[in-house]
Amino acid sequence: MRNNKNQMYIIKIFIAIAMITGIIFLYLFYSSLTTSKLKETSNMDDSLKIKFTLIEQQGKKFDSTNLQGYLSLIYFGTTYSLYDNQALKRVEDIIKILKRENILLQVVFITLDPEHDTSEVLKKYLEKIDSNFIGLTGRVQDIEQLAQQFKVFYTSKIFDVKTNEYALQHSNFVYLISSDGKILSHYYLGS
């Protein structure tokens, strides 16, 4: 039994290292290219350039132009999900490692439940994880539209009578966004 736990721990470490290596590789690769070379060699389509306007945790407007000039990681979730909390902790661990290598990323958490996750709720939630993370909320239809752009699958919010809590099932990916607002890649954060 203990041996299985050790094996699972080692597997999780290897997965985390692979994710970090992939992010570092993509950052170094894309940052070394000039804009013209990027257009010539990239197989990314302009349709993957995201556009949105939402509200950040301070109550101010935040749109896709705020991503320009920064390599960003975007994660979709809810503030009341233990699983999302763990996923953001993994992202935070990756960010700490990258900071030691002088690779700076902007992290954006976008709620899938804007009716619950208001700016104030996001602010309190992200202060507990990392106050540098940006939390975004907005109108339900704006969140739905953005989730469709990212191909995020999620269900309607349901109340679980067993746990006396809300639940919202969703896909669990973090998206790497270029400094010009294009989706470069996505990474599964595991279960």
Swiss-Prot record:
InterPro entries: SCO1/SenC (IPR003782), Thioredoxin-like_sf (IPR036249). It comes from the Bacteria. SUPFAM superfamilies: Thioredoxin-like (SSF52833). CDD domains: SCO (cd02968). It holds the Pfam family SCO1-SenC. Belongs to the SCO1/2 family. This is SCO2-like protein RP031.
